[in-house]
Amino acid sequence: MDLPAATVANLSSRFLDYQYGVLGIETHMQSPDVTEICINRPGELYLETRAGWRREAVPSLTFERARQFCTSIVNESNTGQRITDADPMVSLTFPTGQRAQFVIPPACDAGRVSITIRLPSHTARTLDDYERDGFFADIPEQATAIADHDLELLALRRARDYAQFFRKAVLYRKNIVVSGATGSGKTTFMKSLVDHIPDQERLVTIEDARELFLAQPNIVHLLYSKGGQGTGNVTAKSCMEACLRMKPDRIILA
């Protein structure tokens, strides 16, 4: 899916640094180890480093501060954009290279704001650097044989051990489509699958009605109005575009 280019905001470094301080993320914005900063709910944020996702408690991070951060950044960006209940999703690129995705209600849960900031690399790397660090060792060779994971899944299917088949399919990160008639239990079955996603992964769900209440801690629920029934100018497509800027490990489209 090709994403529209995020608009470049015309903001001064001084203004941005002040806003980072108000939000309580200024230290993380300067960290060479952090590649992503994600705010899903008041009181905490998630940082992505080479070691994976890490939760940080931020008691001063309230809903009001998070929403005001979004409003201040977007309104002062000189891009002609506004973030409002009618247009609750905005993508921006900061002059200093960071890329941001902002989502406010009704496109996410009431009382929450989703802020995702992707930080550019602080160092330039050559192909020799990648070679020395073993980066290319993880590139799989083109194989004609069926992968071991798929052989295991085929064996489970032949044995009709479907509980283990689906459990393993989730752990092996296979794409799964759940379909059925209205009232056939699709959402309930989907929840049973999601239960097996590890807690250290970041999830983003996309729904037209809030039905997926999940236990994973690093999660954002995006909401769109089917048939233009809601107040927000949000579609499944715009949710997917926003989602791809939010660094999900898994996308759950309900």
Which residues are covered by each model-predicted region?
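Switch/coupling sub-region of P-loop NTPases
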Residues: 155-159, 163-179, 192-254
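P-loop NTP-binding catalytic core
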Residues: 54-71, 75-171
